[in-house]
């Protein structure tokens, strides 16, 4: 880029889980590191990796599966840190829609997806469960999966527990229906992945920018770590500061989404090696990565100790599901303490 300003592209319009990035800006943490950051919003979320990979933008956010696929398609990007770790992701639907926990109940239904790789996931899952392409209708929804379910444009769609599922729960509450009528068929279980890490939201860099500016990236991540620590230490105070800067998020839905995102925030920012191995394997299974593909992530720009990975990731997922259900019922800010 021809400017000293670092450009950073969000993966979507500002959401509750973008709070560390904006607070690093408003609280002066970037400035403390001698950085000038321009935070940008995409018109189309599908453009993010292409814009960063082509060098039009320096850094940004994207899910793990998209980060892997971007480099495989000739857009050189690398993950340097994690923002949101393993949010539960799956096929969302409403009770009474004719869909059940039996995946084959999706036969004859309209299934929504965000972008290209969501369609690939649906096709692979339906094939795995003995369905043909003509047995369902795939509908590209962008980030409007919950909206399309509510408007009956689709019967089900791929979404995240702490975002689109909360949106469905809020809709149900206004209809006088229990929030538990919002259901999810988790993709990690359907696809036998053992983790929801393919939708881990990452801080990514253009490779050339990373090569030329290693110290700037280190300083950027120091500022992000300080902001993340601030959010985790006092989430209510942090939220008040965030909505003062982003008043469009000052509503019940956004606050509840923030509560549900809280347990997923990566406190260390470290890329989890085991998750990358699993998702790289999943990408090869989906045929979006070549057989010899090498994962494009690094932790070398994080200047604090790396935590130990959990010894039993399946048990961690089970406990997180219980934790998130309790959060839904009680509306509290709590982190899940997992054994190493």
Swiss-Prot record:
Q: Which cofactor does it need?
A: Fe cation
- One Pfam family hit: NMT1
Chain ranges for the short sequence motif CCCFC as given in the UniProt record: 195-199
- Entries under InterPro entries matching the protein: NMT1/THI5, SsuA/THI5
Q: In which pathway does it act?
A: Cofactor biosynthesis; thiamine diphosphate biosynthesis
Q: Please state what class of enzyme this protein is.
A: transferase
| Keywords, in A-Z order | Iron, Metal-binding, Pyridoxal phosphate, Thiamine biosynthesis, Transferase
- Which residues does pyridoxal 5'-phosphate bind? 115-118
Q: Where is the active site?
A: 66
Which sequence positions carry the modification called N6-(pyridoxal phosphate)lysine? 62
- What Gene3D superfamilies does the database record attribute to this sequence? Periplasmic binding protein-like II
Q: What is its EC number?
A: 2.-.-.-
Report the catalytic activity: N(6)-(pyridoxal phosphate)-L-lysyl-[4-amino-5-hydroxymethyl-2-methylpyrimidine phosphate synthase] + L-histidyl-[4-amino-5-hydroxymethyl-2-methylpyrimidine phosphate synthase] + 2 Fe(3+) + 4 H2O = L-lysyl-[4-amino-5-hydroxymethyl-2-methylpyrimidine phosphate synthase] + (2S)-2-amino-5-hydroxy-4-oxopentanoyl-[4-amino-5-hydroxymethyl-2-methylpyrimidine phosphate synthase] + 4-amino-2-methyl-5-(phosphooxymethyl)pyrimidine + 3-oxopropanoate + 2 Fe(2+) + 2 H(+)
* Subunit note: Homodimer.
**In UniProt terms, what function does this protein have?**
Responsible for the formation of the pyrimidine heterocycle in the thiamine biosynthesis pathway. Catalyzes the formation of hydroxymethylpyrimidine phosphate (HMP-P) from histidine and pyridoxal phosphate (PLP). The protein uses PLP and the active site histidine to form HMP-P, generating an inactive enzyme. The enzyme can only undergo a single turnover, which suggests it is a suicide enzyme.
Further information: Present with 752 molecules/cell in log phase SD medium.
* Name the record gives this protein: 4-amino-5-hydroxymethyl-2-methylpyrimidine phosphate synthase THI11
Q: Which organism is it from?
A: Saccharomyces cerevisiae (strain ATCC 204508 / S288c)
Q: Taxonomic lineage per UniProt?
A: Eukaryota, Fungi, Dikarya, Ascomycota, Saccharomycotina
């Amino acid at each position: 880029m021809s400017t000293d300003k670092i450009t950073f592209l969000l993966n979507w319009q500002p959401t509750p889980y973008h709070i560390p990035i904006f607070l690093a800006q408003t609280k002066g943490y970037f400035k403390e590191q001698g950085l000038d950051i321009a935070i940008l919003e995409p018109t189309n979320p599908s453009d993010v990796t292409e814009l960063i990979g082509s060098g039009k933008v320096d850094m940004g956010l994207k899910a793990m599966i998209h980060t892997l696929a971007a480099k495989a398609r000739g857009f050189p990007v690398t993950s340097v840190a994690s923002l949101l770790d393993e949010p539960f992701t799956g096929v969302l639907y409403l009770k009474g829609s004719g869909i059940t926990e039996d995946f084959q109940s999706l036969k004859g239904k309209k299934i929504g997806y965000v972008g290209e790789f969501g369609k690939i996931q649906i096709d692979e899952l339906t094939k795995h469960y003995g369905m043909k392409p003509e047995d369902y209708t795939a509908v590209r929804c962008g980030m409007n999966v919950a909206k399309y379910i509510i408007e009956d444009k689709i019967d089900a769609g791929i979404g995240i527990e702490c975002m689109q599922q909360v949106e469905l729960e809020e809709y149900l509450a206004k209809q006088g229906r229990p929030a538990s009528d919002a259901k999810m068929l988790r993709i990690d279980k359907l696809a036998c992945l053992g983790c929801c890490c393919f939708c881990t939201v990452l801080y990514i860099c253009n490779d050339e920018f990373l090569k030329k500016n290693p110290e700037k990236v280190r300083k950027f991540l120091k500022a992000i770590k300080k902001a993340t620590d601030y959010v985790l230490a006092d989430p209510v105070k942090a939220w008040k500061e965030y909505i003062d800067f982003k008043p469009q998020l000052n509503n019940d839905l956004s606050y509840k989404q923030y509560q549900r995102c809280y347990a997923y925030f990566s406190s260390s920012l470290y890329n989890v090696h085991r998750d990358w191995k699993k998702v790289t394997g999943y990408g090869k299974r989906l045929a979006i990565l070549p057989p010899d593909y090498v994962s494009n992530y690094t932790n070398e720009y994080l200047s604090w100790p790396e935590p130990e990975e959990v010894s039993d990731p399946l048990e961690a997922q089970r406990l997180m599901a219980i934790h998130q259900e309790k959060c839904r019922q009680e509306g509290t800010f709590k982190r899940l303490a997992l054994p190493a």
